[in-house]
Regions:
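Low-complexity, polar-biased intrinsically disordered regions enriched in Pro/Ser/Thr/Gly
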Residues: 112-113, 231-237, 261-269, 486-510
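Intrinsically disordered, low-complexity N-terminal regions enriched in serine/proline/glycine
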Residues: 6, 47, 277, 292, ...
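Conserved ATP-driven motor cores of ASCE-family P-loop NTPases powering translocation/secretion/packaging/pilus
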Residues: 422-424, 428-531
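A short glycine-/small-residue-rich loop at the edge of a beta-strand within enzyme catalytic domains
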Residues: 13, 106-109, 373, 409, ...
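P-loop NTPase motor domains
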Residues: 121-126, 133-430, 445, 520-541, ...
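Basic- and hydrophobic-enriched, low-structure N-terminal and domain-boundary segments
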Residues: 1-150, 154-160, 167, 507-510, ...
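Intrinsically disordered low-complexity regions specifically enriched for long asparagine
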Residues: 33, 482, 517-521, 620-622, ...
Length: 636
C-alpha cells in the first residue's frame, strides 16, 4: 500500500509538470502567430493566466489525491478489506465470503488504544488494538491453534492474562515448562492475587493439593476420581477389566476417605490421602488383602464402598489378582515421597478462585506423561468444585469470573465430559480457552465428530499459523467461497508476423468463484498475521499483538518456578530428624534452611518472600578489608 501511495504521488507530480510544460509551450507558440501577438494567447485561454492556472491545477491535484488517500487509509482500495490482486464479484451469486471490512470490525468489536480496551485481545489493525468486548452476547470460550513458534504465548496467552488481571478475574493456567509462572507470578501477587503453583516438573517447588480430600464420602466424586485415573493410565484394556479396576480403586478411595482407623494402618504422617490408598492396595498377599476388606464389608453392609467392592469381588480370581497388580503398577508414582507430599496437604483450594481473585499455575512436562493423570485429576475436580459453588449462589454464577487457559491442551490429559463442560460453564461465569498446536492433536483426543463439537462450542477461533495439511484445509474451508470478477482478454495475430499487431482483440467480463483462502495461502501466511473467526462474522485478519506492548509488561520481574518454596516443604525442614553424629543447633538449622532457600534480592517483592516462607533479606554489611598478608587465606 505504501508503494501504491508513492506511485500515485510521483505519477501525479510528474504528470502535472508535463501537462503544465506542454500547455505553456503551446500557448507561447500560438501567441507568436496570433494577429497582434498578445491579443489571442491560447495559454491564457486554457489556464486563465499562468499563475491562476497553476493554482487551479494544484487545487484539483490535491483534491483528487486527497480522495484517493482517504479511500486507501479508511476504506481500503475497494472498501472490501481485500488487498490481493483479486477483484471481488459484484453479486453474491458465486459466493458471499470475504474478509471482514474495517467498518464492520469497528461496529462488532472493541477497537482503540490498548489502554482503553478491556476485552479479550485478538490482535491489531492499523496500529489499533482489536478485542472481543466483555459485554458481547457471544460466549468467551476461545479456541487457539498455532504451530510451534507461532507466538501462542507472546501474542495471545500472556497479553490476555494481563487483561484478565486488570479486570480482577481469576485465572487457572496450564503452564508448559513454567514460563508463565516465571514471568507473571510476581506482579500478580503485587496486584493482590492468591498465587499457587501445582508443579509437576519440579515437585519440591509445588504447592500441595489434597486430591483424595475432594472425595470425602461422596460416591459421585469417587466415581469421577477412579474414572479419570483409569482413563489416563489404562488405554487399550478390555471393558470388563476396566470395570473391575475402576471399582477396586473407587472402593479403596472411599474406604480410606471414610475410615480413619483403617487409614492409620498405612503408618503415614498424613493418613487419609491418595498415598495411603496406594500402600493399602500393594500391601500383603491377595488372600490377605481380600480377607481384610471382605470382612469390613460383611460387618458394615451400609458402607459407602460396599457396592464398588462387590463389583470387584464378583470378578474371577485371576481378574481380581491381575487388576490389583496392574493398579499397583499404575500408581507406582506414589513410591516417590515428593509425589505423596504434593497430593497430601490442603494448600490449593479449588473453590477459592470463584470467591476471590486467584492465579493457579499447573506446570506440565513436555517431555513425559508420568504425572499426566494428576493434572487431569486437578482440572476435572476444578470444574466440579467451581460449578458446585456457582450453582449454590443466588445468581448461579461465580462471584469472581474464572478464566481457564488450557495451553498445550493435549498434555493436560483427558477431562471427563469436556464437551458438556464447554456448553454449560458459560452461564456460570467460567471461560475456557483451549490452546493447541494443530487440529490432529484434538482429533486424537476427541475422535469422530467430537472434535468438531469442541470447536463449535467456542464462538471465537484464532489461527496463528499452520504447518500441517489437516489444519490448513480446515481453515481454508472455514473461510468459505468468495465470488470474483473474471476479466478475459483474447488477442489474435498472424503466426509469421515479425511485428506484434493484433488483428482481433476481444475483452469480456464474467462472474466466477474461488476459496477466500487457498490451502497454500494458509501455509504461506506471514508469521505476523493471525486469522480470527467469530460466530456470525466474516474472517478477520489481524496483526499479532506482542505482550511487550501491554502496559503491564513493564511490571514483569521474572522469578523461576523452581525457586518457589511451598509450606509443606518448609514444614518438612523443621521436622528434619538428624542422622547419627549430626550436630543440631539453631545456627546449623538456619544455615541449612538458607542453603535450600532461594536468594531474595531487591528484584523480588518482600511479600513474595514471606509467602515463600523466607525471612526478610537484610542489607549486606559493609566491611573494610586491609591488605592480605603473605600466607594469609583470602577467606576469613
Amino acid at each position: 500500500m505504501r508503494k501504491l501511495i508513492l506511485y500515485l504521488i510521483t505519477g501525479s507530480v510528474i504528470g502535472l509538470t508535463i501537462l503544465t510544460a506542454v500547455l505553456y509551450s503551446v500557448g507561447f507558440v500560438w501567441s507568436q502567430i496570433a494577429y497582434n501577438g498578445l491579443s489571442f494567447s491560447f495559454w491564457e485561454i486554457l489556464n486563465i493566466g499562468r499563475e491562476e492556472g497553476i493554482i487551479v491545477s494544484g487545487v484539483l491535484f490535491l483534491l483528487i489525491f486527497g480522495i484517493a488517500a482517504w479511500r486507501i487509509f479508511f476504506k481500503g482500495i475497494r472498501g472490501d478489506g481485500e488487498d490481493r490482486d483479486i477483484l471481488p464479484g459484484t453479486t453474491d451469486n458465486q459466493g458471499t465470503s470475504r474478509f471482514m471490512s474495517k467498518e464492520r470490525m469497528r461496529r462488532a468489536l472493541s477497537v482503540g488504544n490498548i489502554k482503553d480496551v478491556n476485552g479479550i485481545i485478538l490482535g491489531t489493525v492499523d496500529g489499533d488494538c482489536v478485542a472481543l468486548p466483555m459485554e458481547s452476547m457471544l460466549n468467551k470460550h476461545i479456541f487457539v491453534c498455532g504451530a510451534p513458534g507461532s507466538m501462542k504465548n507472546r501474542a495471545f496467552l500472556r497479553p490476555n492474562m494481563m487483561q484478565a488481571s486488570l479486570r480482577g478475574e481469576s485465572m487457572i493456567i496450564a503452564d508448559s515448562k513454567g514460563t508463565e509462572y516465571q514471568m507473571q507470578a510476581t506482579y500478580l501477587e503485587k496486584l493482590g492475587y492468591e498465587v499457587k503453583v501445582f508443579n509437576l516438573v519440579n515437585l519440591k517447588a509445588s504447592d500441595s493439593w489434597d486430591c483424595l480430600g475432594e472425595i470425602s464420602e461422596d460416591l459421585n466424586k469417587a466415581t469421577l476420581f477412579a474414572t479419570v485415573v483409569m482413563a489416563n493410565l489404562s488405554d487399550g484394556k478390555a471393558e470388563f477389566w476396566l470395570l473391575a479396576a475402576k471399582n477396586l480403586l473407587k472402593a479403596m478411595c472411599l474406604i480410606v476417605a471414610s475410615d480413619v482407623d483403617l487409614a492409620a494402618t498405612a503408618k503415614t504422617d498424613n493418613q487419609q490421602v491418595i498415598g495411603t490408598v496406594y500402600k493399602l492396595i500393594t500391601t500383603g498377599t491377595q488372600s490377605e488383602f481380600e480377607s481384610t476388606y471382605n470382612g469390613i464389608m460383611k460387618n458394615n453392609k451400609r458402607h459407602v464402598a460396599n457396592a464398588a467392592w462387590s463389583i470387584y469381588a464378583g470378578a474371577s480370581e485371576k481378574v481380581r489378582q491381575d487388576v490389583r497388580h496392574e493398579i499397583g503398577i499404575y500408581l507406582e508414582v506414589f513410591q516417590n515421597p515428593e509425589v505423596v507430599n504434593i497430593t497430601s496437604y490442603n494448600e490449593i483450594n479449588l473453590t477459592l478462585p470463584a470467591v476471590t481473585k486467584c492465579a493457579y499455575f499447573v506446570v506440565l512436562s513436555d517431555q513425559h506423561t508420568t504425572y499426566q493423570f494428576l493434572s487431569s485429576l486437578f482440572f476435572n475436580f476444578l470444574f466440579v468444585d467451581l460449578v458446585e459453588y456457582a450453582d449454590a449462589q443466588p445468581t448461579n454464577r461465580c462471584k469472581v469470573p474464572v478464566n481457564l487457559y488450557l495451553d498445550e491442551f493435549s498434555s493436560i490429559g483427558k477431562i471427563d465430559g469436556f464437551l458438556q463442560k464447554l456448553s454449560s460453564t458459560r452461564s456460570r461465569g467460567i471461560n475456557i480457552c483451549t490452546i493447541c498446536q494443530a487440529l490432529p492433536q484434538i482429533q486424537v483426543m476427541y475422535p469422530g465428530k467430537e472434535w468438531e463439537s469442541l470447536i463449535a462450542c467456542t464462538d471465537t477461533q484464532i489461527y496463528l499459523g499452520s504447518t500441517d495439511e489437516t489444519t490448513a484445509k480446515y481453515i481454508s474451508q472455514r473461510a468459505g467461497i468468495m465470488g470474483v470478477t473474471q476479466n478475459m482478454i483474447r488477442e489474435t495475430r498472424p503466426a509469421l508476423s515479425p511485428i506484434y499487431i493484433p488483428t482481433v482483440y476481444q475483452k469480456s467480463q464474467g462472474e466466477g468463484h474461488r476459496n477466500l483462502l487457498n490451502v497454500d495461502e494458509v501455509y504461506t501466511m506471514d508469521i505476523k498475521y493471525a486469522l480470527v473467526s467469530i460466530r456470525g462474522e466474516h474472517i478477520l485478519r489481524v496483526e499479532k499483538f506482542d505482550y511487550t506492548k501491554h502496559p503491564l509488561a513493564k511490571k514483569i520481574k521474572e522469578v523461576p518456578a523452581s525457586e518457589h518454596r511451598p509450606q509443606w516443604y518448609m514444614d518438612s525442614l523443621q521436622k528434619h530428624e538428624p542422622t547419627k553424629g549430626e550436630v543440631v543447633n539453631q545456627e546449623i538449622a538456619d544455615l541449612h534452611a538458607k542453603q535450600l532457600a532461594p536468594v531474595v534480592t531487591d528484584e523480588v517483592d518482600p511479600r513474595t518472600a514471606v509467602k515463600m516462607g523466607l525471612p526478610p533479606s537484610p542489607a549486606p554489611a559493609k566491611t573494610k578489608r586491609g591488605p592480605r598478608k603473605k600466607g594469609q587465606s583470602q577467606t576469613p
